[in-house]
Swiss-Prot record:
InterPro entries: Prot_disulphide_isomerase (IPR005792), Thioredoxin-like_sf (IPR036249), Thioredoxin_CS (IPR017937), Thioredoxin_domain (IPR013766). GO terms for biological process: platelet aggregation. Disulfide bonds join 74-77, 421-424. GO terms for cellular component: endoplasmic reticulum lumen. Keywords: Chaperone, Disulfide bond, Endoplasmic reticulum, Glycoprotein, Isomerase, Lipid-binding, Redox-active center, Repeat, Signal, Steroid-binding. A motif (Prevents secretion from ER) lies at residues 524-527. It comes from Mus musculus (Mouse). This is Protein disulfide-isomerase A2. Part of a large chaperone multiprotein complex comprising DNAJB11, HSP90B1, HSPA5, HYOU, PDIA2, PDIA4, PDIA6, PPIB, SDF2L1, UGGT1 and very small amounts of ERP29, but not, or at very low levels, CALR nor CANX. It catalyses: Catalyzes the rearrangement of -S-S- bonds in proteins.
Length: 527
């Protein structure tokens, strides 16, 4: 499915590497032949190959067993395969008590039903032979990510620190270390801390109950401290005595404070940018090849601390491969240096009023003005083509959309498309034929709008193609068209004033609108 660069994930959407949804399975799979009980379980690239009989044996033999349910035809499974094998090799080299295995899902329907496998690949982790409550893997699709996730389940997820030497050694080894200072290591707060440590794979965790370490770091109560070798150097999260340690609050705190005050946007940082779940992103567009542009980063960073957790400061290098970001904001590289702010929830974009010098004061003032509602958001629009109304299909842009779509004397049928969308290209002949058929009707307008280059105040377009009908009249009524995209059905829809008979078949899923890229989940092929 083609996907558009979405506002919410505008900065190249951080596909974070957890498992999401994708293609529907249905390809053939060869059923494994019967194997005699007791026969040695085969291996492929360090991975046990299991079926409904040998899975039971493997669970008895291996106290920690991860099983990948895959399909031979599944593209995502094929992409995962080398990483999965590398993870097995990493753990074997460490003599870890974890075994990795796989099951051909289509060949083993009883197992996929038992373990509620709804897509491929699905990874389940079994401990101590318990087949009733396996834990599903939702971490990165990388060898190190899989291996580290397993390490933190078969071994400690955090290091017990008993003296200053241990703390300093841990801090020296890593750029970021999270240390929980707890007076009671058997309490609920400690359990919450360890639960978080199991899944926060990009951080290293330690804990202590030693009074001298509380004193050393100026603490008088239970506190989780993030030590880092950049920016402020340290961030404290005191434990609330009344409510205790909240897993969600601590997780958000660590994500926010593990971010640099200014994050350069690239494919490596984009997952973390969106994982921070900070709704406002302030972007500084600069050309990193120019010294005078690089110097602006000092002031940009100086403005950031008061907005930590509220506004994420991001630098976009216009000299790098970031044309998609520039296009999204309607900018050209030569307009740098410049600022833009986007709310990734509403997708509203803001620009400074007039040309401003980029200083710490002006950056802070711009942020405050947007947050206080003193600056109106802007909409992207192409210029109105001189011949926009000359052909059977009328060309709309943001600047003429309201005037045409809500003309009280016209019934207007609009296709919102993306130039790269395959479904849009497939339906183009039918749309042209529809316009040709009704070109002599004064009361009907067939139009199209490139929704990647034109934004509308009235609504957002979330998939392509999106078809909307604007019937004549003063009510500004909008009817979504969700049926078959062919000339016959389009004509019935128009002739009935925007209605279709109830028995009219709906558009099959294979031709559903192509979604914009607004998911942070990685792919999984559905059953």
């Amino acid at each position: 499915m083609d996907k558009q660069l979405l506002p919410v994930l505008l900065l190249l959407l951080g596909v974070s590497g957890s498992w999401g949804q994708g293609e529907e399975p249905g390809g053939p799979s060869e059923v494994l032949p019967e194997e005699p009980t007791g026969e040695e379980v085969p291996k492929e690239d360090g991975i046990l190959v299991l079926n409904h009989r040998t899975l039971s044996l493997a669970l008895q033999e291996h106290s920690a067993l991860m099983v990948e349910f895959y399909a031979p035809w599944c593209g995502h499974c094929k992409e995962l395969a080398p990483e999965y094998s590398k993870a097995a090799a990493l753990l074997a080299a460490e003599s870890a008590v974890v075994t990795l295995a796989k099951v051909d899902g289509p060949a083993e329907p009883e197992l996929t039903k038992e373990f509620e496998v709804v897509g491929y690949p699905t990874l389940k982790f079994f401990q101590n032979g318990n087949r009733t409550n396996p834990e599903e893997y939702a971490g990165p699709k990388t060898a190190e990510g899989i291996a580290e996730w397993l390490r933190r389940r078969v071994g400690p997820s955090a290091t017990h620190l008993e003296d200053e030497e241990g703390v300093q050694a841990l801090m020296a080894k890593w750029d970021m270390v999270v240390i929980g200072f707890f007076q009671d290591l058997q309490g609920k707060d400690m359990a919450t801390f360890l639960a978080l440590a199991k899944d926060a794979l990009d951080m290293t965790f330690g804990f202590t109950d030693q009074p001298q370490l509380f004193e050393k770091f100026g603490l008088t109560k239970d506190t989780v401290v993030l030590f880092k070798k950049f920016d402020e150097g340290r961030a404290d999260f005191p434990v609330d005595k009344e409510t205790g340690l909240d897993l969600g609050d601590l997780s958000r705190f660590l994500v926010i404070h593990s971010m640099h005050l200014v994050t350069e946007f690239n494919s490596q940082t984009s997952p973390k940018i969106f994982a921070a779940k900070i709704l406002n992103h302030l972007l500084l567009f600069v050309n990193q090849t120019l010294a005078q542009h690089r110097e602006l980063l000092t002031d940009f960073r100086e403005a950031a601390p008061p907005f930590r957790g509220q506004v994420l400061f991001v630098m976009v290098d216009v000299a790098a491969d970031n044309s998609h970001v520039l296009n999204y904001f309607g900018l050209k590289a030569e307009e740098a240096p410049t600022l833009r702010l986007i709310n990734v929830e509403t997708t509203k974009k803001y620009a400074p009023t007039g040309v401003i010098a980029i200083t710490a004061a002006s950056v802070a003032a711009f942020c405050q003005a947007v947050l206080h509602g003193e600056i109106k958001h802007y909409l992207l629009s192409q210029e109105i083509p001189p011949d926009w109304d000359q052909g059977p299909v009328k060309t709309l842009v943001s600047k003429n959309f309201e005037q045409v779509a809500f003309d009280e004397t016209k019934n207007v049928f609009v296709k919102f498309y993306a130039p790269w969308c395959s479904h849009c290209k497939e339906m183009a002949p039918a749309w042209e034929a529809l316009a040709e058929k009704y070109k002599d009707r004064e009361d009907i307008v067939i139009a199209e709008l490139d929704a990647t280059a034109n934004e509308l105040e009235a609504f957002s377009v979330l998939g392509y193609p999106t078809l909307k009908f604007f019937p004549a009249g003063p009510d500004r009524k909008v009817i979504d068209y969700k049926s078959t995209r062919d000339l016959e059905t389009f004509s019935k829809f128009l002739d009935s004033g925007g209605h279709l008979p109830k028995e009219e078949p709906k558009e099959p899923a294979a031709s559903a609108p192509e979604a914009q890229a607004n998911s942070t989940l990685g792919p999984k092929e559905e059953l």
